[in-house]
Amino acid sequence: MSEEMNDQMQVRRQKLQELIDLGIDPFGKRFERSATASELKSQWDEFSKEELHDKEDESHVSIAGRLMTKRGKGKAGFAHVQDLTGQIQIYVRKDQIGEEDFDNLWKGADLGDIVGIEGVMFKTNTGELSVKAKTFTLLSKALRPLPDKFHGLQDIEQRYRQRYLDLITNQDSTQTFINRSKIIQEMRNYLNKQGFLEVETPMMHQIAGGAAARPFVTHHNALDATLYMRIAIELHLKRLIVGGLEKVYEIGRVFRNEGVSTRHNPEFTMIELYEAYADYHDIMDLTESMVRHIAQEVFGSAKVQYNEEEIDLESAWTRLHIVDAVKEATGVDFYQIKSDEEAIAAAKEHGIEITNNMKYGHILNEFFEQKVEETLIQPTFIYGHPIEISPLAKKNPEDPRFTDRFELFIVGREHANAFTELNDPIDQRERFEAQLVEKAQGNDEAHEMDEDYIEALEYGMPPTGGLGIGIDRLVMLLTDSPSIRDVLLFPYMRQK
């Protein structure tokens, strides 16, 4: 910390002690507000200076917030007070709030202090709506000065590490998180109206399942048991489908022990939903309708800007088989490739990076990820994923090499994963056994055998469609945020 900052903190500590010596509580008590900054502007800004003067008797208000600017000398001064909704100017005069409060509270007030004001509305000569203070109350003394003259943090990493400072100084950041909350609320509203039931399932699992990812491992001391933080919500929700809860969803945290990037955080928020008697076509329709609804309700339009690109959520979304997508981009037709050896040869010919033990389906997926994925800017459903990478999805009845699965891509990123759920317990066991072979060959993200889940399927699960959406990435898209850290209040940061 700079010498200047240390000096400022020392002065603030001295002011704190002076307040205590005067018998003033520098950290205040309950303060009743009558309005927020935005409410005052909505109610009073339409009136002229003269009209407000005539309405002074009926414009008594009380506001509270953080002191963001302060100016003026002598017996009067102006300041801006900020709350969640914005800023409002206040005007403080000694002959209005009293000599004692003016000298002890107003004159010693620092930027960052939290204050309460009671007064009346008026407009200045320049036409700015303001509150003429009748009382001025200190609610919390700030012992540290705000960074960068309160114009916002310039150090991006500091914004993430000290989100509270970012929220104080950056209204755009605050609005992003308000919008995040609204997005999740509209998601709930949409699903509740569709008859879905919101549920809660365990975050600590005995088997890490439901996705291809490395788990975080923990230990239950009393039971002497190894547990895994969930990498997906899926398998517990499908047990509920077996139990007769026909339309369920959960919004919750998921944990994956993987890298950190602009698109990945070790803990993130997902929604997973499952609907009995539906298939992946129904879930495509639901996904498209729900995302469009959220954009329209929260932002007033189903066309959004992302990184200077207009994303059209309003028009019908493209639906493309993964084989056709690869063929369009590379000319390679995986319908005509009949063996792993042919797939490996095609990969070598087109410079596709593959690893040992990859089979037909893995190689098709590598073609897609390396040649197609980043080109999918407008909303596109890619469906028909190969069976090797879809251990929980139902086989396509017309071509068992593929599954009834889709992923949603927008701005070159995956935003959703869904399929017609595999409800055949015999097939499911065979898929898990194939995953165990992959694990033995070095794929540490392959799925474990889950006997309890197979037992649940043996009681009978109806045909079911399921969906998972990464909420953080959806918020990134809808708020035009370049990094996942911009939409997580407290993203993971490497320790200093």
UniProtKB/Swiss-Prot annotation:
<keyword id="KW-0030">Aminoacyl-tRNA synthetase</keyword>
<keyword id="KW-0648">Protein biosynthesis</keyword>
<feature type="binding site">
    <location>
        <position position="414"/>
    </location>
    <ligand>
        <name>Mg(2+) 2</name>
    </ligand>
</feature>
<dbReference type="InterPro" id="IPR018149">
    <property type="entry name" value="Lys-tRNA-synth_II_C"/>
</dbReference>
<comment type="similarity">
    <text>Belongs to the class-II aminoacyl-tRNA synthetase family.</text>
</comment>
<dbReference type="GO" id="GO:0000287">
    <property type="term" value="F:magnesium ion binding"/>
</dbReference>
<dbReference type="InterPro" id="IPR012340">
    <property type="entry name" value="NA-bd_OB-fold"/>
</dbReference>
<keyword id="KW-0479">Metal-binding</keyword>
<dbReference type="InterPro" id="IPR034762">
    <property type="entry name" value="Lys-tRNA-ligase_II_bac/euk"/>
</dbReference>
<keyword id="KW-0067">ATP-binding</keyword>
<keyword id="KW-0436">Ligase</keyword>
<dbReference type="InterPro" id="IPR006195">
    <property type="entry name" value="aa-tRNA-synth_II"/>
</dbReference>
<dbReference type="GO" id="GO:0140096">
    <property type="term" value="F:catalytic activity, acting on a protein"/>
</dbReference>
<protein>
    <recommendedName>
        <fullName>Lysine--tRNA ligase</fullName>
        <ecNumber>6.1.1.6</ecNumber>
    </recommendedName>
</protein>
<dbReference type="GO" id="GO:0005829">
    <property type="term" value="C:cytosol"/>
</dbReference>
<dbReference type="GO" id="GO:0016740">
    <property type="term" value="F:transferase activity"/>
</dbReference>
<comment type="subunit">
    <text>Homodimer.</text>
</comment>
<dbReference type="GO" id="GO:0005524">
    <property type="term" value="F:ATP binding"/>
</dbReference>
<keyword id="KW-0460">Magnesium</keyword>
<feature type="binding site">
    <location>
        <position position="414"/>
    </location>
    <ligand>
        <name>Mg(2+) 1</name>
    </ligand>
</feature>
<dbReference type="GO" id="GO:0004824">
    <property type="term" value="F:lysine-tRNA ligase activity"/>
</dbReference>
<dbReference type="GO" id="GO:0000049">
    <property type="term" value="F:tRNA binding"/>
</dbReference>
<keyword id="KW-0963">Cytoplasm</keyword>
<keyword id="KW-0547">Nucleotide-binding</keyword>
<dbReference type="GO" id="GO:0006430">
    <property type="term" value="P:lysyl-tRNA aminoacylation"/>
</dbReference>
<dbReference type="InterPro" id="IPR004365">
    <property type="entry name" value="NA-bd_OB_tRNA"/>
</dbReference>
<dbReference type="InterPro" id="IPR044136">
    <property type="entry name" value="Lys-tRNA-ligase_II_N"/>
</dbReference>
<feature type="binding site">
    <location>
        <position position="407"/>
    </location>
    <ligand>
        <name>Mg(2+) 1</name>
    </ligand>
</feature>
<dbReference type="InterPro" id="IPR002313">
    <property type="entry name" value="Lys-tRNA-ligase_II"/>
</dbReference>
<dbReference type="Pfam" id="PF01336">
    <property type="entry name" value="tRNA_anti-codon"/>
</dbReference>
<dbReference type="InterPro" id="IPR045864">
    <property type="entry name" value="aa-tRNA-synth_II/BPL/LPL"/>
</dbReference>
<dbReference type="InterPro" id="IPR004364">
    <property type="entry name" value="Aa-tRNA-synt_II"/>
</dbReference>
<dbReference type="Pfam" id="PF00152">
    <property type="entry name" value="tRNA-synt_2"/>
</dbReference>
